[in-house]
Amino acid sequence: DDLLASYKDNLANYQSLKATMLSKMFPKAGQTVPEIRLDGFEGEWVEKKLKDISKRVTRKNNDLVSERALTISAQFGLIDQEEFFQKKIASKDVSGYYLIKKGEFAYNKSYSTGYPLGAIKRLDKYENGVLSTLYILFKAVDVDSDYLAHYYESDKWHREVSMCAAEGARNHGLLNIAPADFFNTRLVIPKELEEQRAIGTYFINLDNLINSHQEKISQLETLKKKLLQDMFI
């Protein structure tokens, strides 16, 4: 029990550290340098429109390359619908869906608790998958992909998106934002690719620590359950 408690404490500390760093390692609105910066980097960051550093993806799943219907989960990112909901929500025919490939991004415009402006996630878990055409897909071009993935985990993009999002029909819970407006949103990025990479790597290492602790906690809880069952047989 002590071991389990210590892993849970460490996990909470790492999660808290990540939340703090996501708020402080990207500049606040109207600023061009972050509150906390990695050693060895200086100078102001630059403002870019998303369309200048990315390319929209609109390829359809015409040849049924994939039948893995994905959904965006706040905790797990882009994940197989069957794995997440324990059932398939998408229609039987997914040929009209977008085909997303590993490393590409998707913006889910539906808002939920803690995600007032929807969520933007990168596909990391599978080689490909399909998404409803309600999603906006893109890939990083003139920016480090790991940097961008973690920038969109912060709330720094919310202000820009909220300025061009008119709420659509409430019953769908979807934000009414046109792709052209979405790609015109501005973000501040380090001028040097090296700094972008360093930030991306910092957060990847932190994610790995969090994931390994979550796995260890899960293993210990399973073991504890088994030991308790054995005791009462």
Language-model regions: role of each:
Residues 95-159, 166, 170-171, 178:
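A short beta-sheet element
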Residues 136-144, 175-197, 231-232:
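Proline-centric
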Residues 1-46, 192-233:
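Amphipathic alpha-helical segments with low aromatic content
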Residues 34-37, 133-136, 181-185, 206:
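Short amphipathic alpha-helical segments
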Residues 54, 58-90:
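DNA target-recognition patches
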Residues 5, 88-94, 171, 193, ...:
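Short, solvent-exposed loop/turn positions at domain surfaces
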Residues 37-61:
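Non-catalytic DNA-recognition/assembly elements of restriction-modification systems
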Residues 28-31, 128-130, 177-180, 200:
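Short, flexible turn/loop "capping" segments at secondary-structure junctions
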